[in-house]
Amino acid sequence: DGSYILASETCALDIIGANFIREIENGEVVVITKRGLKSYHPFPKKKVRHCIFEYIYFARPDSIVGGHSVYECRKSLGRELAKESHVEADMIIPVPDSGVPSAVGYSEESGVPFELGIIRNHYVGRTFIEPQQSIRAFSVKLKHNANRALVGGKKIVLVDDSIVRGTTSVKIVQMMRDAGASEVHMRIAAPPITHPDFYGIDTPSQDQLLAATKSLQEMGDYLGADSLSFLSVDGLYRAMGHPKGRDNDCPQYTDHCFTGDYPTNLIDEDGEQDFKQLSLLTVSNTPEQ
């Protein structure tokens, strides 16, 4: 009927039966009036660098971001993860729900069966953004339960999308142990998160990020897993369709949570030198890549 609908993800358009036309470009101003739609570009053109965490976790798997199916991207992450860190096991189990597509890809690549060894309560929200540790821990208990009849006596690979503080992972590994799993291996379909985000996402300060404070061995011991592996940064880029991996001179995505390569300079608002205090952003004076 000539109406326009704007949404942050394409899945919202699917739900109401709207047709996806295109994404609004970086720096573009779209004005919609009774006379129609007009597009303006008042700012200089910049290189498009989507946040790679949209593909890993934030976007819904049934959305299209930057022309890519989020679901297929996550399956590809799992396939690349299986190539990098295969381990002998009886089954591949996703940490639901965000770990499901990557676990499917891991299973397809490794040839190890995919099973639903964890049942999720869908009425509990995301745990990593809960403000208090006690609330996060209790939320994990409410959110997940082991499929005991399936995992007892089995060697399992748990596939998750990422690890922030490790709150969920510790509880999940112990849950699998309590359910009788003989071995529990953690495989993470993203690189270690070593730097906080200062662009509106409620990630912790750096000293609360598990991968920023512990070595790989220390993280595995902390989680209680028999082994722990993360997808490499280059593996992440290969999974996203870049065979040569990350272009370090001109990165294809913003990936500062993994690399510390922030797209803008960071200024300490209160004058403190401690990195975790950095909060105020300013446009970088460095040449645009």
Language model regions located:
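PRPP-associated nucleotide enzymes
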Residues: D1-Q289
